[in-house]
Each structure stands twice: as C-alpha cells, then as structure tokens.
C-alpha cells in the first residue's frame, strides 16, 4: 500500500516570512524599471530591508482583520462547505432519510487544505507569541501615545528585564509607526517630548536612552496621565503599560476616557506587565472591555497570559481540530483504506503538536520541579480554633460578662407590689445579650476603647491570612492539609485550550504543598480514567519529579467522567481508608460532571462516612463555550455548576474552592476568615453603640438638670407684670374752669 506523507511541513510557501521574501523579490523585479537600478549585492539587501519594513508595517495595520481573511469560514473549510461538495443519494426507496457520499478526491483535497490552514495558524501563533508581541501584544495604529507606569519600577534584575522588553518593543513595533508621544506616570507625569514627534532613528535612540533612566515614583496616577495624552487629538492609538493597580476606580477611568474620546477614532490597548496581584488584572480587564479595546496580560511568574489575538486564533484552531474528528468519522465509513490512513496520520500529528506547543507557557514550564518543604497547613476552620476571636478571648460577650448584671425584681411588703431595681444611667446601659435576654451593662469607656484596638489588630491578622490564601498554589487549590492525598485532574476535551494552566497549577502544588505529605497519587480523567501509579506511593523528591514528567504528557479528550475518577480513588487508593487518618481527595475540574449530582453526592456521602476522608473540589471557570464550537457532553451555567459541586463537597464534609482568571470567586477557607472579620466589625460597632448610649444618657441628664435650674427664672421673666388701678386725685384748676 502506498503511504502518503501529510506532515505539517507541507506547503512551506505559506510561511509568512517566506511569503514576504518571495513577495519582496517579485517587487524588486517589478520595480527595477522604476529608477531603482541595482548594481551591487549590498544595494539588493538594502532594498529588501526597505521593502520588508514597508510590508511589515502593512501587516501590523491589517492584523485585526487577519483572522477574518484566513478563518475556516472564509477559506470555505467548514463542515457545511464539505457537505455541499458531496452527493445526496437515497439508498433505499422506502427510507426517506438521504445519505451524503463523498469521493476520495473531495476528502483528499479538503483535508489537504485544512492541514495547510492549521499550519498557517501555527506560524501566526508563533509570530504573535514572540519577542515584544508576547510581552505587550500587537500595537495597532500609526500615531501612538505610550503611557508607562513607573510607580512599581524598582532596582535589580526586574528593572533591567522591563527595560530590555521596552527596548524590544521600540525596535520591533514602535519603529514602524509614524508619530510617537511618550510619558511615564507615578505620583506625577513626566514626558519625553512636549508634543508628538515623527519617528526617526534619532527619536528612537533618544527614547531607548530615556527608558534606561526610569525611576520609581509614588503611586499610579493613571488619570493624570490620561488627561495629558487624550488632549493630543492627532493620536489614533493609546497604549498604557501598567505594573500596578491604578489609583482611580475603573468606572471613573472608563467614564473619563469615553467622554474624552467622544467623536474620535482612538484604539485603546492596555497592558499589565508582570502584575503579581490578580486584582489589577481584573480591574483593568473590565476597564478595557467597557471601552471596547484590547487587553493584554503578561505575568509568567503568576501563570497569567491573556491576549485577544491569541485567544481568537486558538479558538479557530480548536474548531479545526473538531473538524478533523468529523473527517475521521467519515473515513470509518469510507472503503478507501489509503485515504483512511492519510486522515488518521494527519489527525495524529494535529493532536500531538499544534495546540499544546502553541499555547503560551510560563518560564521553565517543562523544567524539573523546585521543591519546597512547607509547614503542615491547616484549614481556616482549624486555624480559627487557635487564632479566632473566641480563642483569643476577644468575643464581645466574653469582655462584657464581668460587668453584666441581670435585672432584679423583688416584692416589697410595705408597698405590697413587685419593684424592679433602678438603673444608674450615668454608668449603666441596657444591652441585649446573645441569648436574647436583656442585661444591665456597666460601661467602662477606656476598657472598650482598648478592646476595639485589639479587634483592629486581630482584623489585620485575618486580612494577612486572606492575602496568603490568594497567593501561589493556594489560589488554585486552597490549602492541602491531609497527609494522604489523591489529586484528580480534569482533562476532558473542553479543557484542551487550558491544559497549560492545568499543568502549571499542578506544578505549583507539587512544588509547594505536597513535599510534606506521606502518600500521594495523581489521576487524570476524561471519558476514561488514567492514574500515574496503580496505587498511592510514598512522597519523595524522585516521585514528585516523576509525577510531573507524567503530567507533561497529558492530552485532553473525551467527556467528564467524575464518578469513574472518584471510584478509582476511593476503591483503589483509599481501599483501607478506615485504617488511616488525615486523608483527602482534591478534584480539580472545569465543568459539570457527566453523572447526576445526586448520584455523586450519595456515593461520596457513603464512601466518606465513618472514616477520616474528605472530598475537596477546586473548580476553575474558563468561560462559556463558544456557540460555533463542538458542544460539551454535559452543560450547565457557571452558577449551576458551582452549586452542584458545593452539594457534593457538603455531602463529603469537604471544602469548595472556585477561582477564575480574575481571582478567587468563592472559597470555604476564605469565607471562614471573612466571617470572622465581619464578626469583629460587628463587635466594634456594638462597642461604639454602648459608649454612644452612655454619652446620650449623660447628655440628657445634664440637659434636664440645666432645664430644672433655669425653669423658675424663665417662668418669672415670662409672667406679665400686674397692673394696679391709678390712685384717685383732685381735679386740676384747668378742669375746674
């Protein structure tokens, strides 16, 4: 049988760089009559360089429409296009359902074109994820205003790396623009030129030298920088490179930009460069979405990489993979063995290379683990037993108890009735107790003020705990506390675009939280279940490294057989679960399971009952599936998915952890700390209420005393004087006349 080679090296003339060289050579030939007489090889090289620069400039300007001009739909490589090339036949006159038949040549030609298109996507992906485009994205526009955040620029290797990346951006992208306007901002703004300048060799050199002198300065006053750059009406592109969260709220910045750009065609491009905190990424992404611009996040240390161009290209490549699966199904019904082998060979190559090799990876993603030995972490519930308000004797009722008195009522024989004790309102306030009763509290303001200070210190400790829970591997997994641990990894086909994220999350866990455990195992599941080892093995440096190398070879396929993975873990790895303590299963998944939630809940409730075994769910949200992609086997909204897994964790007495690209959405560990903070704030408010009530009573007493003192004088002054009748007098001489 003759075997065709359909490798990804076919049709190399579609390489953008080779196309560019070929086009340039053709242009040289065509332009040789336009006064460009080449007499030396150096002149040819200069001319090629000039032509290449002009072509690259055009490519940068038209890149927004690149995918539209090379999409599967535009290239007529969709399933509908394939069906339109087939012939409809009725095999049985009694059967009204027609069947579509394809010739070998039709499928052969369609598959060849699809393979070429995927190769082109590969080349485009490499181009988008190299050099300055990886760090800052693809800068659009010809007259660019560049804002550089200098608030977090610090000395050391980080500064040098940032300056080198900026220099690369200047050489590769900004050098192809027409005009530039550059300023830095921190507490104040500093501009290189008072007005936009024409791009030339001298201005670019001046800019590169200026970048080397960047110094840290205060906070991140983005609004002040925007006011200056948006006043330059000649600019058609605004690029902001930030390394920290802006001082102003995103809603305020969005309103200001929209009002300032009303009636203008201005492209907004916001970059977060190595922002270690997830909060700036969330704020700036929402800001860019509201403005209809492009957001680019580059933070390899935190495993954050977001690019709209890359995401759209990956989605189109994913559709091509789905189409190949459909072609494979066609070949099973095709009698041509040669064609079936050809399709199988191409699909195998695609499954191996185009996706995981093109996905952006953190630095040293495939390097050996750097294993740390941490302390044995506790869940927040256990941690609060030692550091909570009650454990620290900072409960409000604990503090007030020595000065709290029950109301006293006794029968007075001489009065022949029951009389209640009088409250001394100058020092006591009636206060509702935690059991609903009312007690008389002796209020001592200095004691309560000191108590509020202690509450403030406790809240600071809780806030540090919250921040600690949101960093490194705990952001993805929470705290892994048990001594015997099994990790379940969701590698269903819907997670194909996120396999690097899944692997990186596992890497952080292996490095930071598993080295102090006793036994562990890793189970990957899609439609089928595959485990790293048949059963749990002892934790060692070598075993952790071997587990990581195994995880690097994982491929996403099939649906989401959660029940199968749970059964493998519980019935094989934890078959002796009643003989051991401190055992945990950590399910790392991105969507709703294949099985009904009630079935899962009933199974884990029975399996985890009567032993020290917990199921903890780590749910990562990857967004809603695209309407034009292959639908998942089971679908539920993000809220329904979260509710389903919360029900499962509650049945297994475990913890629920839900996160996404913008941070942690919900976590039982974090919720426990937040609840303790809210309790401390509530206690502080009640202290303030007690002091205010005491002051209010004292103020009323003083006012009453003053009124009583002034009352007689006021009444005396207000009474009208009594008028007496005039005394009788004798008639005057005038009246007698």
From Swiss-Prot:
Name of the protein described by the UniProt record: von Willebrand factor A domain-containing protein 3A
Stored PANTHER family: VON WILLEBRAND FACTOR A DOMAIN-CONTAINING PROTEIN 3A (PTHR46478:SF1)
Gene: Vwa3a
Bias (Basic and acidic residues) ranges: 1-17
Stretch list, region Disordered: 1-22, 711-737
One Pfam entry name: VWA_3
Cleavable signal peptide: none
Residue ranges annotated for the VWFA domain, each copy included: 484-681
InterPro entries xref list: VWF_A, vWFA_dom_sf
